[in-house]
């Protein structure tokens, strides 16, 4: 289908725009930009150099994609923001491109970023993530597939959040949040296994029980976290989910969030 592009939009002729794209008045699109098929760009959106957008994305009013990183190390190098397919950016979202030459900020497929969310430079976001109103993710973070952030969450630089974890509203955290759990509070603490989401994903009951047993060893045991990992390997039946937990904890550089 033909594109529907307002003559009041400001679009650099070098920008690569796919098929069946709708661009509303007063959108601003720079030249080093790729926009896939079936995207909708609302009024007053800025799509800036280095942005590579997949198919079927929706970008609402006043959002800025590919903004220069808010990082004193940035020297004007050519960097990118990579956006997957069917991503929704609601009003006033800001996503920065990477800092150093050749670097990328990445947003996976089918993510949903609510009003006022901000994803900073060099952060990597997996698919199917949700970012609530006003949530701010600092630079160099790693967000796993299906992670859910409630409103007004602040993730400090370089933290990791595991697959299908949920961060409760108003939480600020500076340590890693392992997969499949709920975390919240001040200071942030473990709040149990995210059974609601695991049920939604149709994870078997025995797998959910194994996940709960693994985290019982980590958060309720009397040993160090890394001794708890050894106990998980010895006591909890193996599965991809258990391996995900083990590998995540072994890979932490900042440490994981507090015990109860």
Model-derived features: positions:
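Structural signal for interior beta-strand "rungs" in well-ordered beta-sheet cores
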Residues: 4-184, 188-189
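Terminal amphipathic alpha-helical/low-complexity segments used for targeting or macromolecular assembly
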Residues: 1-8, 13-14, 19-20, 56, ...
């Amino acid at each position: 289908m033909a594109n529907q592009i307002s003559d009041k939009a400001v679009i650099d002729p070098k920008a690569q725009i796919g098929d069946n794209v709708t661009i509303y008045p007063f959108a601003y699109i720079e030249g080093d930009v790729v926009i896939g098929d079936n995207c909708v760009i609302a009024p007053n959106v800025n799509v800036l150099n280095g942005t590579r957008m997949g198919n079927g994305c929706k970008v609402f009013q006043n959002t800025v994609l590919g903004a220069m990183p808010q990082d004193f190390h940035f020297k004007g190098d050519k960097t990118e923001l990579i956006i997957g397919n069917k991503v929704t950016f609601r009003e006033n979202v800001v996503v920065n491109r990477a800092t150093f030459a050749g670097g990328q900020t990445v947003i996976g497929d089918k993510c949903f970023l609510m009003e006022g969310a901000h994803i900073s430079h060099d952060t990597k976001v997996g698919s199917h993530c949700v970012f609530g109103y006003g949530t701010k993710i600092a630079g160099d973070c790693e967000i796993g597939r299906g992670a859910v952030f409630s409103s007004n969450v602040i993730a400090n630089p370089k933290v990791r959040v595991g697959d299908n974890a949920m961060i409760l509203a108003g939480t600020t955290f500076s340590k890693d949040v392992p997969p499949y759990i709920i975390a919240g509070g001040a200071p942030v603490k473990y709040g149990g296994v995210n059974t609601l989401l695991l049920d939604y994903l149709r994870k078997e009951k025995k797998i959910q029980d194994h996940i709960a047993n693994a985290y019982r060893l980590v958060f309720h045991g009397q040993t160090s976290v890394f001794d708890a990992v050894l106990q998980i390997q010895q006591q909890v039946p193996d599965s991809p989910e258990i391996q995900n937990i083990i590998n995540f904890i072994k890979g932490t550089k900042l440490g994981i969030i507090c015990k109860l």
